[in-house]
Amino acid sequence: MNEATPKAPGPRSLQRATRRPVRVPGADAVTIGFLPEAPSTPALVTPDGPGVDLPGWLRSNRDAVEARLLRHGAILLRGFHRGSVEKFEQAASAVCGTLFREYGDLPREGESERVYKSTPYPEDLSILFHNESSHLPQWPMRQFFSCIVAPHTGGQTPIVDCRTVLDRMRPELAELFATKKLRYVRNFIDGVDVSWSRFFGTDDPAEVERKCAEEGTSFEWTPDGGLRTSRQAEAVLRHPVTGEAVFFNQLALHHPSSLDPETRSSLLAICGDQGMPRNVFWGDGSVIDDAVVTEVRDLMDRESVAFTWQEGDVLVIDNMLVAHSRSPFTGPRKIVVALGDMTGGSVPTLSSVSSV
């Protein structure tokens, strides 16, 4: 795949880019194009014939794959092999080298230490848009998904370009996110969500305290043996490679308005704002109005694209350029996940979006 490295354009440039499939000749010939239902992202790569080894192809074309990711934010690799956790891990490793193996927010896939199951959540509910680990001091620049078993209906993993989201957000609201930032408050309660021991990878409270102090996360042990953490994080960042401003956070996923009204009312009555399993505030601790979250959520939904999973599909995303979600589904569904190129701390921040 001897492609010149393409310059990464902004979201408006993406809309003007050609959408005709391009055949890349060679021993492992592939065609690069787009899905009819998703004309700007993800880029679709399919083999021109049988026998193209996906991990080998990715290793041979790593620079071109990286350039495509920076341009489109996501790549869908389809038709290379049947659903296989082993092949998936090899493919992800071909792109990133070392995969992250200490992520406490996802259950580990039993076949591998570097592959995770997707988020366990009721099949009839949506998981809202978020950038993986954007509420934490470290996050993966690359996230991989693969379909091992396709659901009967639904179960898509919609994606949305975070450059476009910021570009089309009301300027006043974008400025608020850049200047006020966000504060994530999390309560680790036995039997609700993930436990603090699994999240931190230790049963030792002293080790948890050490990790929190190292990450700049405030913490408090509750009388019932639970743990409350609070951490301020950016809502808008600059991509460290392209320099583009991106809307990068877990606002929709953590805000109480993401819950159904009955569950939200019950949890608030029992726990209060500060006792919810997950919550997000403005950086100064003030409450974010539901209307703000609804506006952002509606914008992300409008700009999103989705495709139907096929067994063996591998989706690669730039976790800062693209946010993802999950649609409700019926039937068995097995989507596995891998994370790579961990970063954080040195990523450029924005004190204002007025000059973007």
PLM regions: where:
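Histidine-anchored nucleotide/phosphate-binding helix
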Residues: V65
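Active-site environment of non-heme Fe oxygenases that use a 2-His-1-carboxylate facial triad
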Residues: N2-G56, R68-L70, E123-F129, Q138-V314, ...
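Glycine-rich loop at the start of a catalytic domain that most often binds anionic cofactors/ligands
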Residues: R82-G97
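Basic- and aromatic-enriched surface patches that contact anionic nucleotides/nucleic acids
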Residues: H135
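A gly/proline- and charged-residue-enriched helix-loop-helix capping module
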Residues: L99-N131
